[in-house]
Structure formats: structure tokens, C-alpha cells
Amino acid sequence: MHIREYQQWLEEWDKERTWDKVLASHTLLHALEELGEVSKLIQIIEGYRAGEGVTPTQLQDDLALELSDLQVMLFKIAYLCGIDMETAMIRGQHKADARFPDPTTGPATRQSYWQHFRAYLAERGLEADPPA
């Protein structure tokens, strides 16, 4: 299925249930709720938050479903606002290629990120590397 086909399917599916009448601003609230669920799962996967009794496979499956739920809300906001996501995503690819045309600059950009991050922590008296 192509991106445009998915968006058209979603709009028709919503229309059959009259969910196409929900305001984009309210759909955004639902998207933020889904984003929170994605955030919680990533925190568990990365070890920042405890995940009692959940296997890595279950976490990955749950994350896939929550990402799908978030995608639904984003595609819904797009169709409610008259935006074709396939076109928008192609434009986004062109924007990224124009902004970062040379893939070899990735390591330098990443190194700069870490330098800024460590400086931020040092300015606040926080440790860059937690004690072992």
C-alpha cells in the first residue's frame, strides 16, 4: 500500500464512523496521548523506566502498535487539514537532502551534539557519566 492509498483508506474509514467530524485540534490531543505511550515504552526499552514482567519482544510489539496509533492520528490531522502526506513526505526528503547533502558530515554533527550536551551538564553541575 502506498502512503496516499493509506491516507485515503483512513479518511473513508473515519467517514463511515463519522470520526472525520472530529476537529484537528482534538485529534492532536489524541496524537499527544499516543506520543506519551510511545515515550513510556522507549523509556522502558532503554532502561530509564522499569518494565515489570514485560519481555523485550512484548515491548517491541507494543511499541510497533503505539507507533501505528500515533501514525493514524498524524495522517488524520493531515487529511483534516487538506494535506497529502505522500507529497509532504517527499518534500521532507528534499528538505533533508538539501540541508544535509553530505553524509560524511554526520559524525561531526553527532560529535558537536555531544559536546553541547556535556557542556550543558557541566554548566549545571551535573555528571556527564554517572558513577559505576
What are these regions (language model features)?
Residues 1-67, 71-132:
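Flexible "arm" and connector segments at domain edges
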